[in-house]
Amino acid sequence: MPLTLSFLPSFERSLKNLDTEQKEIIRILLKALTAYYDSHSNLHEAQKNAPGFFYKQLRKPFYEAGVERKLRLVIRREGETCAAMMAGNHDQVRRFLANQ
């Protein structure tokens, strides 16, 4: 069964701090992430939508996804349920995780 993605209020709040270009990058990232989850975590399928797509575990239960190194998406993964928690740059992600 493929993983499912939901969005937490903290993710919606983090989008308000992004400019139009960054929001477009997040849109591309979410499309690639959806392809990754729908293909049972096949990285090649996700990279068809976004060649620079990456997905890695930070520490349980937190994962990070991105299509470029500047913007990342923090995901909390529990079983087959994944929740997008926030979008931001490296420093914003570190600060966010320090408070979790």
Please name every model-derived segment.
Residues 1-71, 77-82, 87-100:
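Basic, Lys/Arg-enriched alpha-helical interface segments
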